UniProtKB/Swiss-Prot annotation:
Gene, per the UniProt record: cysD
Protein name as annotated: Sulfate adenylyltransferase subunit 2
Keyword set includes Nucleotide-binding: yes
Pathway the protein acts in: Sulfur metabolism; hydrogen sulfide biosynthesis; sulfite from sulfate: step 1/3
Positions of the UniProt region annotated as Disordered: 1-22, 298-317
Keywords, in A-Z order: ATP-binding, Nucleotide-binding, Nucleotidyltransferase, Transferase
NCBIfam families given in the database record: CysD, PRK05253.1, PRK12563.1
């Protein structure tokens, strides 16, 4: 599948490109089938685009599903204003390269009240700038289906979520009120006002994602690769200290470390890991011996016991 606009700035570090093995091909086929089912069943689908590795794979699969046509639905980026600068640069280049329709939404209430992760804490910040903002954007666009890049291996509440995740008119998720999914048969019938979150990557693992990125040569944000970067130790995490809005607390010292990120979100709430992985092969080798979840680097998952399920019940991604 050729790029509509070649761009050398969006290339990963040089890597071997192995053929797509049968396991990855089966996952790819399943995901493409889901994209086509949703496009046929629903009137106004949208794809949630958070710019990370899973979103990059999701977008690649969407492009494959409808090639040689354009992706037939818009991308929605819920922008908190606190993303890594590299993520926004990457997003804009991707949109240009693939001729995509992008909707960017920032919660006007959060912006007016100057809600930040520093002043209001991660729980309230996430609720207003992510969950509430997402509900606003979905309502404004009258979208009845929203693709997301969540995987079942990431976290406990996501492990029990179906591929078609039904939401009430106020976007709430009730795990006890979901439909059975038999093989590849999905029931997309909804009542007026209801919607569905759709997760084509449900059955993928983190290593699957990286192997697919390698095999398909999918560009990703450079922050996933190790490099010397400024960091500060805070709340048990290494926070990247490249943004001038990050003010050092008493006793904190900025230093340089060779780091990378396993997961990307808002920079004040995303912890880096020490790593020497500068290529896709290095990243995959590192993950194959990893003993902790990628979500360990997300501060929002530490808010309280069961916090991710609580957020999802309220309408989170």
């Amino acid at each position: 599948m050729p790029d509509s606009r070649p761009d050398t700035e969006l290339s990963n570090p040089q890597s071997t490109k192995p053929p797509l093995d049968p396991h990855l091909k089966a996952l790819e086929n399943e995901s493409i089938h889901i994209f086509r089912e949703v496009a046929a069943e629903f009137e106004r689908p949208v794809m949630l685009y958070s710019i990370g590795k899973d979103s990059s794979v999701l977008l690649h699969l969407a492009r494959k599903a409808f090639y040689p046509g354009r992706v037939p639905f818009p991308l929605l980026h819920v922008n908190t204003g606190w993303k890594f600068a590299e993520m926004i640069t990457f997003r804009d280049e991707i949109v240009k390269r693939y001729d995509l329709d992008l909707i960017e939404h920032i919660n006007p209430r959060g912006k007016a009240e100057n809600i930040t992760p520093f002043t209001h804490g991660s729980a309230r910040y996430t609720d207003i700038m992510k969950t509430e903002a997402l509900r606003q954007a979905l309502d404004a666009g009258q979208f009845d289906a929203a693709f997301g890049g969540a995987r079942r291996d990431e976290e406990a509440s996501r492990a029990k979520e179906r591929i078609y995740s039904f939401r009430t008119p106020d976007h709430r998720w009730d795990p006890r009120n979901q439909r059975p999914e038999l093989w590849n048969v999905y029931n997309g019938q909804i009542r007026k006002g209801e919607s569905v979150r759709v997760f084509p990557l449900s059955n993928w693992t983190e290593v699957d994602i990286w192997r697919y990125i390698q095999a398909e040569d999918i560009p990703i944000v450079p922050l996933y690769f190790a490099e010397k970067r400024p960091v500060v130790e805070r709340d048990g995490m290494m926070i990247m200290a490249a943004d001038p809005r990050l003010e050092l607390l008493p006793g904190e010292v900025k230093r340089e470390e060779v780091i990378r990120f396993r997961t990307l979100g808002c920079f004040p709430l995303t912890g880096a890991i020490r790593s020497t992985a500068t290529t896709l092969e290095d990243v995959i080798a590192e993950l194959e011996i990893a003993t902790v979840s990628e979500r360990q680097g997300r501060a929002i998952d530490r808010d309280q016991s069961g916090s991710m399920e609580k957020k999802k019940r309220e309408g989170y991604f």
